[in-house]
């Protein structure tokens, strides 16, 4: 069954291409995601001679992993030509379809994806493709935005449009809940799946500054059914008013929530620990007392 088409893939590519040169100006989320990746790698007692980065943006991960003692070469994949060109500064980089990996990819020790999967229509399908690229006992690691991301902006825009327009048009993408995405690793055949979530609060001078930075990140509105015209000025002004009234700080700033969900799994291998079968334990609780 075909996945629901929530996003316009052509618009996603257009936004990534248009703002590729400016992503580095507002890359704090990408840098945090890369830091979480490196923290995870540092805890793992093994090396990764080859790694594939899916949705690599400007090669943030490949740049950070240069010289890392546990990582060899990094292959960066992205659907935007300018992102591929930027990532190629740090190693091999190729084009990919928004939701499909190239057919001729080599098997690899690790597949990662940092802040990309939340823009994909068929998340289960892409995770399965990524899992198939792994060698036995290979690492899958991804970070995506979760459902609490931009919850303040979503609520403020919804209220403003209902008041002024009498209805709501799509502006902010629906994002996955951690309870939903954790099961996708098992569906992809990955062992020892783990899902973690952290909520980050970032302050901005205004709603308009927040929305400007979202565009520079390549995270603008790419939803199917979005209005082709610009959002009306009175709606935007009312959104800013509601946002400030409900969430604004004493010093005139506004907070914005970003939920980052981390997914970790491993391709199956005989060397991995396995849970005991029920009833196969060699001792009982009474032996402890």
Q: In which residue ranges do the predicted regions lie?
A:
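A structural alpha-helix within SAM-dependent methyltransferase catalytic domains
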Residues: 38, 127-131, 154
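Catalytic cores of nucleotide-enabled group-transfer and carboxylate-activating enzymes in metabolic
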Residues: 91, 99-101, 105, 130, ...
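C-terminal lobe and adjacent flexible extensions of AdoMet/dcAdoMet transferase-like proteins
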Residues: 188, 208-289
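A short glycine-rich, Lys/Arg-flanked "PGG" loop and its adjoining helix->strand segment in the class I
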Residues: 124-139
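Class I SAM-dependent methyltransferase SAM/SAH-binding core
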Residues: 39-104, 110, 124-125
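Conserved catalytic/acceptor-binding region of the Class I
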Residues: 141-209, 217-230
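Class I SAM-dependent methyltransferase Rossmann-like catalytic core
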Residues: 1-49
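Short catalytic micro-motifs in class I SAM-dependent methyltransferases
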Residues: 115-119
């Amino acid at each position: 069954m075909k996945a629901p088409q929530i996003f316009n893939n052509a618009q996603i590519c257009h936004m990534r291409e248009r703002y590729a040169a400016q992503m580095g100006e507002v890359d704090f989320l990408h840098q945090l995601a890369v830091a979480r990746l490196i923290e995870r790698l540092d805890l793992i007692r093994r090396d990764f001679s080859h790694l594939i980065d899916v949705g690599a943006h400007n090669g943030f991960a490949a740049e950070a992993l240069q010289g890392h003692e546990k990582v060899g070469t990094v292959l960066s994949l992205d659907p935007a030509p300018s992102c591929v060109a930027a990532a190629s500064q740090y190693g091999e980089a190729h084009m990919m379809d928004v939701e499909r990996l190239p057919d001729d990819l080599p098997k690899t020790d690790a597949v990662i994806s940092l802040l990309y999967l939340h823009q994909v229509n068929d998340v289960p399908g892409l995770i399965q493709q990524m899992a198939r690229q792994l060698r036995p006992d290979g690492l899958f690691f991804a970070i995506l935005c979760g459902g609490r991301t931009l919850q303040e902006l979503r609520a403020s825009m919804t209220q403003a449009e209902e008041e002024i327009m009498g209805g709501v048009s799509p502006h902010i993408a629906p994002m996955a809940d951690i309870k939903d995405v954790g099961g996708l690793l098992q569906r992809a055949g990955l062992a020892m799946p783990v899902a973690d979530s952290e909520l980050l609060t970032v302050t901005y001078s205004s709603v308009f500054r927040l929305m400007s930075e979202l565009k520079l990140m390549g995270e603008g509105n790419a939803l199917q059914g979005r209005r082709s015209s610009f959002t009306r000025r009175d709606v935007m002004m009312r959104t800013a008013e509601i946002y400030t009234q409900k969430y604004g700080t004493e010093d005139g700033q506004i907070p914005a929530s970003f939920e980052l969900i981390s997914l970790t799994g491993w391709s199956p291998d005989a060397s991995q620990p396995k849970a005991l079968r029920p009833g196969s334990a060699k001792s009982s609780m009474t032996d402890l007392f």
